């Protein structure tokens, strides 16, 4: 049954929103994996664990916003299987941040692609929604991750575990 509230909402936009929901849930799932990896007793970096747990919750909120948007536009939600994260072991904090940066770049590209689909189908509501709730936030997240990676690299954190510990404690807010 078609929605009575649907107006100027192209089927391509609807399908792309469903794919974006899946990508946001995958990102949340990946960040959950990272969070609990860093809270393991043999890794024990609580600042990284907290940072990735917050990112997981943020990505889940992004998915929820898209689900709400889909319903408000009269679209239909078709959830897909959520892919397993690319790894179970995330290595050092630097390794995980590099994976996180790539994940955020992938999400950003998917959002830009979604914006293009909306623009191509003259959907100003979707364009405004993406610009208001997602695009700037993605750029800020990418910048923050890049800064973290630069600082950890500068401290040679892969070889210097004390640097990683201090970064976790002072930058990521880790408490024992």
Curated annotation (Swiss-Prot):
Signal peptide annotation: none
Annotated binding of Fe cation 1, by residue: 24, 59, 62
Protein name per its UniProtKB record: Ferritin, middle subunit
Expression across tissues: Liver and spleen (at protein level).
Role summary: Stores iron in a soluble, non-toxic, readily available form. Important for iron homeostasis. Has ferroxidase activity. Iron is taken up in the ferrous form and deposited as ferric hydroxides after oxidation.
Entry EC no(s): 1.16.3.1
Record-linked CDD domains: Euk_Ferritin (cd01056)
Subunit structure: In liver, forms a heteromer consisting of middle and heavy subunits. In spleen, forms a homomer. The functional molecule forms a roughly spherical shell with a diameter of 12 nm and contains a central cavity into which the insoluble mineral iron core is deposited.
Binding-site positions, Fe cation 2: 59, 104, 138
Catalytic activity: 4 Fe(2+) + O2 + 4 H(+) = 4 Fe(3+) + 2 H2O
Limits of the Ferritin-like diiron domain: 7-156
């Amino acid at each position: 049954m078609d929605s009575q509230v649907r107006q100027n909402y192209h089927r391509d936009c609807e399908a792309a929103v469903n794919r974006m929901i899946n990508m946001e849930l995958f990102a949340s799932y990946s960040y959950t994996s990272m969070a609990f990896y860093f809270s393991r007793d043999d890794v024990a970096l609580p600042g990284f664990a907290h940072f990735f747990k917050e990112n997981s919750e943020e990505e889940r909120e992004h998915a929820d916003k898209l689900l709400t948007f889909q319903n408000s536009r009269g679209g239909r939600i078709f959830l897909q299987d959520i892919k397993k994260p690319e790894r179970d072991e995330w290595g050092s904090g630097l390794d995980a941040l590099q994976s996180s940066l790539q994940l955020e770049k992938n999400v950003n590209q998917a959002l830009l692609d979604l914006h293009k689909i909306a623009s191509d189908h003259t959907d100003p509501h979707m364009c405004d929604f993406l610009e208001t709730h997602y695009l700037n936030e993605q750029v800020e997240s990418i910048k923050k991750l890049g800064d973290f990676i630069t600082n950890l690299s500068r401290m040679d954190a892969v070889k210097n575990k004390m640097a990683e510990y201090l970064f976790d404690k002072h930058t990521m807010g880790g408490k024992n």
